[in-house]
Amino acid sequence: MPRTVFCQYEQRDAEGLDFVPYPGELGQRIFNNIGKQAWAAWLAHQTMLINENRLSPRTPEHRAFLEGELVKFLFEKDAQKPAGFTPEA
């Protein structure tokens, strides 16, 4: 039986993640409060940020930026698309 959490992103009960997806306290917060669909939405948003801003997850400054955007996206509903972003038709 899947684990259920109240997803703070979707503001409803949702299927929980199967594992802690991120290290540390933030990872535990995500595991306890974010559902699978919301996490998948973050991964898609993160990919867009990496591609549009030409970020490298290996660079500490870029990792810090992505972590800040992760918190904004999942918990603060304040994430924005990169400047000049236009989705493919």
Swiss-Prot record:
This entry's Gene Ontology molecular function terms read: iron ion binding
Sorted alphabetically, the keyword list is: Iron
* Keyword match Iron: yes
Cellular component, GO annotation: cytosol
Fetch the Gene3D superfamilies from UniProt: Fe(II) trafficking protein YggX
Signal peptide range equals none
GO terms (BP aspect): cellular response to oxidative stress
Q: What does this protein do?
A: Could be a mediator in iron transactions between iron acquisition and iron-requiring processes, such as synthesis and/or repair of Fe-S clusters in biosynthetic enzymes.
| Listed PANTHER family | FE(2+)-TRAFFICKING PROTEIN-RELATED
What family does the Swiss-Prot or TrEMBL record give for this protein? Belongs to the Fe(2+)-trafficking protein family.
Q: Which HAMAP family match?
A: Fe_traffic_YggX (MF_00686)
Query: What is the name of the protein in this document?
Result: Probable Fe(2+)-trafficking protein
Q: What is the originating organism of this protein?
A: Stenotrophomonas maltophilia (strain K279a)
Specify the taxonomic lineage.
Answer: Bacteria, Pseudomonadati, Pseudomonadota, Gammaproteobacteria, Lysobacterales
